[in-house]
Amino acid sequence: VKDLVNIDFLDECKSIRYNNNYKKEGINVNMVVDKESEIEMRTYERGVENETLSCGSGVTAAALSFAFLKSKESSINVRTKGGVLKVDFSLQNGHFEDVYLMGPAQYVYRGEFDL
């Protein structure tokens, strides 16, 4: 997408998430903006059925896709609502190797459930 702010994010994501092609198993929806030296990303996660602060597998997939399309060879920063994550990798002969996701970890929720 061109802009992650001026978009009806939840409605757009729901139209993809609940599309008949994906509805049975469900999918996460990631929207990404190319910021030249980094990317910005928002995620709608199945199961949560709402926007989340970040998604590790989505961040990694988006960063590697960006790297492949832009011929980047070492690392990509990804800006999410939860903070900035860095994906390090090595691109060798069109294949990614040594892929690492790095960033802060913090509690965002604590709860109890009585049975």
PLM features per residue range, with description:
Residues 1-54, 63-115:
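Active-site proximal loop and beta-alpha junction motif in alpha/beta enzyme cores
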Residues 57:
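Short secondary-structure boundary segments
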